[in-house]
Amino acid sequence: MTPGIRPLVAGNWKMNGTSASLNELRMIGNGFMSGLDAETEALVCVPATLLSHAAEILSRTPVHAGGEDCHTKESGAYTGCISAEMLKDAGASHVIVGHSECREQRGEDDATVQAKAAAAWRAGLVAIICIGETQQQREAGATLEVLSRQVAGSVPPSATPSNTVIAYEPVWAIGTGLTPTAADVAEAHAHIRERLSEKLGASAAKTRILYGGSVKPSNAVELLGVRNVDGALVGGASLKAADFLGIAEAYRSISG
């Protein structure tokens, strides 16, 4: 945790969920109404097909609804794409950009990620900018170099704590069950904070840096208690209310 920063626990449902899954979302919202919102801010990013339903369900709770990706353009002949304006219209408050799956599967580079973040801001959304190294880069000892390059290229120079969240997601830990050590996470997050300070100045000290990569209730206290870890970007565990709430519950132990 970082003193003075309210943590954020953000779920990413990815390409999962239908209308039948919305009951899990209701349980997440209800769970935060029991006092968890005093410990942490919460967000669930859902597929575009569910976003308007999710926003309506969560509007009566402290939990926000978000989008999983957006296009760089506001509108146009981009079949199958979703603009930030569309997400905002459907009820989103945040959007994930630069997720490793998008970088790898769609060939997104840092410049595209930065353009998506700027598009999110124009629409009035908070951009969650994802960065992280692959297994090959990690084994080559290039983790910090990769993070430096991604902060430089993916984060717009006008980023502020109110419009931007950074999510460090070691690619090799996503959905694999593998988790870096607390020392590894501490080193990566401290490095990201330093690079943000060089780029953004004093505001970097208040910019939230989330950890993402096989976060679950059983390891949440250890990971989320690391200095400069200001919350979590949660994948598979966000699909089940009990798991997502269990991760958020970690902050009761950490803050207590």
Curated annotation (Swiss-Prot):
List the GO cellular component terms.
Answer: cytosol
**GO terms, molecular function:** triose-phosphate isomerase activity
Record's superkingdom?
Bacteria
Which amino acid positions bind substrate, per UniProt? 12-14, 175, 214, 235-236
Catalytic residues in the record: 99 (electrophile), 169 (proton acceptor)
Q: Which reaction does it catalyse?
A: D-glyceraldehyde 3-phosphate = dihydroxyacetone phosphate
Q: What is this protein called?
A: Triosephosphate isomerase
In the UniProt record, the gene name given for this protein reads tpiA
